[in-house]
A protein has these predicted regions:
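Intrinsically disordered, low-complexity Pro/Gly/Ser/Thr-rich segments with frequent PxxP/GP/PP motifs
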Residues: 317-353
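Conserved SGNH/GDSL esterase-like catalytic core that processes O-acyl groups on lipids
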Residues: 76-117
């Protein structure tokens, strides 16, 4: 068998394929938090910090034949675009001890690691921290008990956070992580996943506003590792925690942490604002459920919104999830533009085993 017939080595890194890789990287990044810090102005000098500013390790573990030499680093792209910025690695992706645990070789950087540069950061400075897992820490045969960032990166982040609160954190990862501390001390957080060959350019263009983020989470980001596994479609129980019984101890709840994730499935921010209105649900003559709504861009820049349609089974003969995603549609809108969105759902799609 040859499932990739027609794809030769000469066609892998063409300009067309690079453009597609750039588009996919940009659209898959998820803006998790933004306290009016992003997008950054290119006229303002910014410090880019963290081991991923100088690393080509942006591919996924599943990219077995991926060519790291073809990946540009964030520092490379900043220089190519002539963006005024200072790049400091600060630490390695993994410590020497962590490299032994994960059976990888240390990726040595020729960048100086003198910590005196930290003393030059003032409370007015903006720092973009590019942090994350090593690519060996996700994918097959990479189970983890703790989902925090590697230790040296945590230390680096805390030292930066002691100097300034104007922090944008870009997270490179192949799985959900425990990002609570990062989120608490960052004014903006971008989940970049493992963005691939053109990931560095996509991240930079997103930070500076050339790309308006439109990605949504395909997983839930836990409030802490104790919530794992956590899913938006967790099944109902006989003692569901609701807004009406928050003081009732005898509900399905954690006593010391929230029940809800830090960032839920389907979540993702934009640099513009959207409004979904005029929602209608009706049964068509062919027995399909028709869901209609209008979505409008109420902000000042063009953007894309992913309209998501969920349903809940109120009564069933077996335990059903709290809610289930049944349809979604990505809608591109200019400022002030409004569009109709229609979903048609067959009745069979509401069926389940055991009925």
């Amino acid at each position: 068998e040859n499932p990739f017939a027609g794809l030769g080595k000469s066609g892998k890194l063409t300009l067309h394929n690079r453009k597609k890789a750039y588009q996919l990287a940009g659209e898959s990044c998820v803006l998790l938090k933004n306290e009016k810090l992003l997008p950054l102005s290119m006229k303002k000098k910014v410090i880019w910090a963290g081991p991923y500013t100088a690393s080509r390790e942006l591919l996924s573990r599943w990219s077995i034949f991926g060519e790291h030499e073809a990946v540009e680093t964030i520092e490379d792209v900043l220089q190519k675009k002539q963006i005024e910025a200072e790049c400091i690695t600060g630490c390695n992706i993994l410590s020497d001890e962590e490299c032994k645990v994960w059976q990888v070789e240390q990726e040595l950087s020729d960048k100086p690691r003198d910590e005196q540069w930290l003393e030059t950061i003032t409370h007015e400075d903006t720092v973009v921290c590019v942090l994350g897992e090593h690519e060996s820490q996700s994918g097959e045969a990479a189970s983890r008990a703790f989902l925090t960032l590697p230790e040296e990166q945590q230390v680096l982040f805390e030292k930066i956070a002691e100097r300034t609160s104007n922090i944008v954190t870009v997270v490179i990862t192949g799985r959900p992580l425990d990002l609570r501390r990062i989120s608490e001390r960052s004014k903006a957080v971008i989940m970049a996943w493992r963005p691939g060959t053109m990931g560095a350019e996509a991240i930079i263009d997103l930070v500076y506003g050339r790309i308006n983020p439109s990605g949504k989470l395909a997983v839930s980001i836990p409030w802490c590792v104790g919530q794992v596994p956590i899913s938006y479609w967790d099944v109902k129980t006989g003692h569901v925690l609701t807004a009406d019984n928050l003081e009732n101890r005898f509900t399905s709840r954690y006593m010391d942490i929230p029940n809800t994730p830090l960032y839920p499935f389907g979540f993702g921010l934009s640099y513009t604002e959207f409004d979904v209105s005029d929602v209608e649900v009706r049964m068509e003559q062919d027995k399909r459920v028709h869901v209609h709504c209008k979505v409008s861009n109420t902000g000042n820049i063009a953007g894309a919104e992913v309209v998501q349609c969920y349903y809940e089974t109120l009564h069933a003969s077996v335990v059903r999830p709290m809610k289930e995603l049944v349809r979604f549609q990505k809608v591109f809108l200019d400022p002030g533009e409004k569009k109709d969105v229609d979903f048609f759902i067959d009745q069979e799609e509401f069926s389940y085993y055991g009925k």
